[in-house]
């Protein structure tokens, strides 16, 4: 299934989004750091607070939403004909899209971290870096992307407009931060964004809650995706 989904991808559209959004976040963060260099004195840590602020606060959830919506756009252009004629179950297509989107998001995160290192090393002129805490945030951000992929995958089955998907992802980002500032773990990525911006490790209890909410959101989104596909295929 995954190989089949890869063949159907419109790589140009996804590649442009995947390259531009992490680049913009790093550029804004770097410019903000250089403009406030006198007050930001901790080099890598200071640059990270600026870069992660822009990326996780404004860009990451919309990026995920655009990627999964792009994957479903291919099916919508064919009026879901391939899914309708396939002997495979609807949920198989949903899981395949989720898996492919997860791989693409993971690659975006590796690219984002690489840009962070290159900008700090060659533009800001920092010395060597201890990657441990940044890798920790990247791994968590990749894992916590799964619920978002599931949620916007379900929405993308019913909503064909990219504009509406981006708008909903922006509203979802605002909602996530509103809950995260109250220490709620409903939107794991928003909670992670606050912790990452403050360079804090997340406690075991909080990680367990994030996993619990995330698993619940994935299960619900898979169920809704299956129902939405059945409705669309009528």
Task: Give the positions of each predicted feature.
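Short loop-to-helix capping motifs
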Residues: 12-13, 89, 160-162
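Secretory targeting signals
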Residues: 23-64, 68-70, 95-162, 199-205, ...
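Terminal transmembrane helical anchor/hairpin motif
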Residues: 28-48, 166-234
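Helix-loop-helix units of permease transmembrane domains in multi-pass membrane transporters
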Residues: 69-102
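Hydrophobic alpha-helical interface/terminus motif in multipass membrane transporters
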Residues: 72, 80, 115, 119, ...
């Amino acid at each position: 299934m995954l190989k089949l989904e890869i063949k159907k991808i419109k790589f140009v559209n996804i590649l442009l989004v995947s390259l531009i959004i992490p680049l913009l976040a790093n550029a804004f963060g770097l410019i903000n750091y250089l403009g406030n260099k006198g007050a930001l004195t901790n080099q890598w840590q200071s640059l990270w607070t600026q870069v992660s602020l822009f990326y996780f606060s404004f860009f990451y959830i919309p990026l995920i939403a655009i990627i999964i919506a792009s994957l479903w756009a291919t099916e919508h252009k064919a009026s879901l004909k391939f899914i309708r004629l396939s002997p495979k179950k609807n949920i198989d297509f949903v899981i395949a899209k989720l898996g492919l989107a997860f791989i693409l998001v993971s690659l975006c995160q590796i690219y984002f971290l690489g840009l962070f290192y290159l900008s700090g090393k060659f533009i800001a002129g920092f010395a060597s870096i201890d990657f441990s805490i940044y890798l920790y945030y990247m791994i968590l951000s990749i894992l916590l992307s799964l619920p978002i992929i599931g949620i916007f995958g379900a929405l993308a089955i019913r909503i064909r407009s990219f504009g509406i998907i981006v708008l909903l992802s922006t509203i979802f980002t605002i909602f996530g931060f509103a809950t995260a500032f109250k220490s709620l773990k409903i939107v794991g990525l928003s909670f992670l964004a606050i912790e990452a911006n403050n360079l804090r490790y997340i406690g075991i209890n909080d990680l367990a809650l994030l996993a619990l909410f995330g698993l619940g959101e994935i299960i619900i989104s898979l169920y809704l995706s299956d129902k939405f596909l059945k409705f669309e295929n009528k």
